Amino acid sequence: MAAMRPALTPAYRAVIGASDPIMRQWSRMEVTGLEALPATGPVLLAANHDSYWDPIAIGVAAAPTRQIHALAKSSLWKPVIGWVLDGMGQIPVERGRGDASAMDRAIEALREGKCIGIFPEATRSKGLELRARSGFGRLARAVPEATIVCATVTGTVDDARFPKRPYVRVDFFRPADAHVDPDEPPAALPTRLLAEIRARAPHVVPGRRPKPVAPA
């Protein structure tokens, strides 16, 4: 019997349902490579993070296939917003220290067959080259059966041509080297993934519009 596709939680469905028309009204949005994102089973999703719009764009792009349970900074958990984020299955992370509780929740979610989304850089790049953090690698070691998928988001940093809508593209793909080696440092895997991601979605200074990189 085929595995059942995980259902979207009511809060997630509502937020994505409201965000989709806003995203598509604000931008000319294109989604490619969605077939790389499995409809069932544990998934670790890595993506670039250049704009506050990125998690919204990725969530909207993936919604036909999966709900993404993202690790997000705990400071977002304010009254009302925190309740919504909890309903969406998002996981708060205390930045600046190893948050074992967040890692445990993410591992549990993966073992339940959910899709965990992580920005390897752990914060918005703001046009700077940041190193990959080790969290993604630790999750991949803990749940080696998880499928590793990458996503690139381009166009979200630029609204300088307003009222002309920016061209936003979300591209999902399977990385060339997703091998989980228990003998290498935990940051080695996310470093490789980030290199592949940034080859397709170079760092962008806010307000600048890069030329899109064609999918490999």
Language-model regions, residue ranges each:
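Conserved beta-strand scaffold positions in the cores of enzyme catalytic domains, especially
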Residues: 31, 70, 90-92, 148, ...
